[in-house]
Amino acid sequence: MYSKLMFFFALCSISFLFTSEAASTMLLESSYLPLNQSYAPGFLYKRDMLPPPLQAVLTYTCPEPRPLAEESYNDLLRAISQKSSSDFQNAYSLALSFSSDFYQHGLKTLKDVSFLAVEKFLWGLTRLWSSLILASFSALWWLVSNFTTPVFCLALLYTVTKYMVKTVSFLFGGLPIWIISIAFSLLKKSFSALRSTPKCLYEKAIDGFKSFTIPQSPPKSCVIPITHASGNHAGYASCIKLYNGENALMTATHVLRDCPNAVAVSAKGLKTRIPLAEFKTIAKSDKGDVTLLRGPPNWEGLLGCKAANVITAANLAKCKASIYSFDRDGWVSSYAEIVGSEGTDVMVLSHTEGGHSGSPYFNGKTILGVHSGASATGNYNLMAPIPSLPGLTSPTYVFETTAPQGRVFAQEDIAEIEGLYAQVMKRVQQAEDFKPKTGKYWGDMEDDEDIFFESKEDLSGKRSARHRPRNKRRRQLHPKDKQRRWERDDGENNLISSGKDKSREHREESDRGDLRESDENSEIPPQKSPKETAGEFERYFSSLYNWEVPTSPREVPGFRHCGKLPQYYHPKQKEESSWGKTLVGNHPALGEKTSGFGWPKFGPEAELKSLRLQASRWLERAQSAEIPSDAERERVIQKTADVYHPCQTNGPAATRGGTLTWNNFMIDFKQAVFSLEFDAGIELPYIAYGKPTHRGWVEDQKLLPILAQLTFFRLQKMLEVNFEDMGPEELVRNGLCDPIRLFVKGEPHKQAKLDEGRYRLIMSVSLVDQLVARVLFQNQNKREIALWRAIPSKPGFGLSTDEQVLDFVESLARQVGTTTTEVVANWKNYLTPTDCSGFDWSVADWMLHDDMIVRNRLTIDLNPATERLRSCWLRCISNSVLCLSDGTLLAQIHPGVQKSGSYNTSSSNSRIRVMAAFHTGAIWAMAMGDDALESNPADLAAYKKLGFKVEVSGQLEFCSHIFRAPDLALPVNENKMIYKLIYGYNPGSGNAEVVSNYLAACFSVLNELRHDPASVELLYSWLVDPVLPQKIPGE
């Protein structure tokens, strides 16, 4: 029986193995069965692999299933095991599903319970904490109310202990780390400074700037050489007056930094040497590069110097200057010019050499600043301005006189400069209450240089106390006070006087001034401000226009009749003077020289006739002219900007920072006003006020502020009004510009022009338009004049002396790369002299636009406000309203034409002439107006395409002079000058002023002819000798 059970168990096991193997085989092979194969019972239990499927379609017929009783035990066991496995899998899946649902439900319940528990815990903690705080405050209040004194004592002890612990912690923990970090930071900054590109070089010669050096000592011997301890030269310093009664030594900071053992040396033959270590710092700035030092007692006497006055940055003006240096032959003075600002530095045109640092720039006897170095990128030197330190470099109770030509720095730049000396300003405020030990300033005592005046009333009876004028007086300390101040000065604390220590006399003057002003205000009603008055002037001038077009308008090609102004100009016809007729009658050879010339016609009819003739020729040339492509124009614009690069300048101060402000505008306005030609005509419509010249407005204290307001109003309108689509009349009616007066120039004309009626017309702009142009362009134009040797434009040179002629020829020789003798003798091998006929009328609108692009590219700090103002100015000058002498207004239809009386005419004409040469293929060119010298060959056909009528001269001719030698240039218009001389004056009238003017003109003409002694002698006998015997009153 036992053996049967064992056999049955073994049989079941083997059957189970076979079943598992067959099932696995079926699972592996079932994926390879054809899709159309039918399932047959017993197929899963076959162990042999199925044969490859046939290509043909097979049809199987399933047999009827056999009864279970006919199956073998193996098949039955396999079926039982498969059934068991299937049931087990189903039960397992069901159990797994139930378990998953139970887990998810349990997890959700646990999460909800946890959130609830945390919330209850936090609220419980909040209640506990608030209860503790409430209990603490209650306990603290109970302690304070019942034990007040002990509690406050404990609080005080706790505070003291806390800060003691912090102090000890800082001393033994934070302080060493702080010292190490500071040292590391200094090393890092030093390394960065050594690696970085310097902002300025120490010395530089300015390209194109002509300076001169003359033997001259500094004012008051106030410039002091600084040397190394070894005696080698290191730089310069200067002795200046301070407003606290002291004298200070001023030098450049980098001189002291580079020379730690510097010594001040007397330059007056004395052997005194004072180490600068004996001096103590008053004010210092590394970035500002100015250091003020307080010296030991009587240091000025030991060095043999006196103190000079200074101008601070707030009042620094663009002006002429001089800089002093000491060479082996003594002191010399070099010419310089203050031209603008660069950040907190001042741009200076000057020639300097090694060792000039620290030397002051002077205007007259006043120090303007300290030489700092040269710009690393720009064509100019840099001067460190003197900061305005109340009580030191500027007064605390009076205002310094405003610089006559406007300030160099805008208000924001001045604030930045003063910020460099913030520590000094702080010490100034702390020392305002200083009073000398004696109780009285030495300046309030008698001074050797004071001059006193006495009236007759002072001579009778008791003599009254003498009072001296107190204007701009600086108090001087007694030498003992100076010594005590120097001895107790640690180099940081500076004793500075303030307004509280004002002298009694000055306080009395101030009080009387306030009282007098109060009296005036009580008697005289308030006057209108200049702004209000300027508004009334604008309305008055606008009322003069009549914009109604007459029924029979005057027709001019390129212009339309648009209105009328009252007639203010009545030009008189010039006639040949009786003096000239007498001279020609006595000297027939003089008549031969002056034949072929005559005076033109004057008046509106002559103006209209000439205008029609020239305008028709202008339109004819303009129609045949071709405008270059955009690429060609850009090429010439960039090339022009490159050759004019030495004349890069700052834009107007008026729009610095992108905004037009009154204070900055006044900087430019003052400079513009003082550079005007005072005797020039004021033009339309301002002539209606009855003052015909600039002088009448500029020198009138009441009209000058109004003129400033009128100019400022115009600039504001140019910024605010949409001018882009306005015509000439609209520009005038909207107050963006004034009409341009047209008149015939009062100079002799050739007979051919007189017969044709082609007179030379002048288009003169108004005073306000002049000022607007000067505000926008004066920096650039003046820089071009100063640096004419470095750029193609030559408006700044002259040919009145042999030295000037040689100077120009040397510049020309450098341009062509040869010697002066060679370029004059064989000029055809190097250049072509050309002249353009009717140049002003040939200037097209696109040429003016390209010239403005070059101007903008040469402006360092160009901003949208400056660009818009210049664009509006260009729109107005290209689309003008001309006014004849009888008041007829003619609006320009086609834009263009250079206006001969504009402030920019000389500068722009020269540059446009150079650009025209570049358009025709010239490699280089130099021009003065319409005259030009350019590289070979000149392409006249290309000029004609541009609309110019250009002719080549057969001689080396430039600016109406023919060059015969490097220092010899003969005028071309000799006969024209003589005609104007003899027929334009009438010294026979006996008027002293007429005779004086005639003789001055004679000597000017004779100077032009100086290289022909025989001609000069002959003309002298003809023109001068008959006048000399006359007695001229006042001589």
Swiss-Prot record:
Every Peptidase S39 domain range: 206-400
GO biological process, one term: proteolysis
Keywords, ordered alphabetically: Hydrolase, Membrane, Multifunctional enzyme, Nucleotide-binding, Nucleotidyltransferase, Protease, RNA-directed RNA polymerase, Serine protease, Signal, Transferase, Transmembrane, Transmembrane helix, Viral RNA replication
Highest taxon in the source lineage: Viruses
Biased amino acid composition, Basic residues: 463-477
Positions of transmembrane segments: 115-135, 137-157, 167-187
Signal peptide: 1-22
Residues marked Cleavage (site): 203-204, 400-401
InterPro entries tied to this protein: DNA/RNA_pol_sf (IPR043502), Peptidase_S1_PA (IPR009003), Peptidase_S1_PA_chymotrypsin (IPR043504), Peptidase_S39B_luteovirus (IPR000382), RNA-dir_pol_luteovirus (IPR001795), RNA-dir_pol_PSvirus (IPR007094)
Active site: 254 (for protease activity), 289 (for protease activity), 357 (for protease activity)
Biased composition (Basic and acidic residues): 478-488, 499-519
Keyword set includes Transferase: yes
Recorded GO MF terms: nucleotide binding; RNA binding; RNA-directed RNA polymerase activity; serine-type endopeptidase activity
One of the record's GO cellular component terms: membrane
Pfam families: Peptidase_S39, RdRP_4
CDD domains xref list: ps-ssRNAv_Solemoviridae_RdRp (cd23180)
Protein's UniProt keywords contain S-adenosyl-L-methionine: no
Domain RdRp catalytic: residue ranges: 829-944
S-S bridge residues: none
Catalytic reactions of this protein: RNA(n) + a ribonucleoside 5'-triphosphate = RNA(n+1) + diphosphate
Disordered, as annotated region: 455-534
Modification after translation: Specific enzymatic cleavages in vivo yield mature proteins. The protease probably cleaves itself and releases the RdRp (Potential). Cleavages have been shown in the P1 protein, but since the N-terminus containing the serine protease is shared between P1 and P1-P2, cleavages should also occur within the P1-P2 protein.
UniProt-listed Enzyme Commission number(s): 3.4.21.-, 2.7.7.48
Function statement: Precursor from which the RNA-dependent RNA polymerase (RdRp) is probably released. RNA-dependent RNA polymerase plays an essential role in virus replication (Potential).
Name the record gives this protein: Protein P1-P2
Organism: Turnip yellows virus (isolate FL-1)
Lineage of origin: Viruses, Riboviria, Orthornavirae, Pisuviricota, Pisoniviricetes
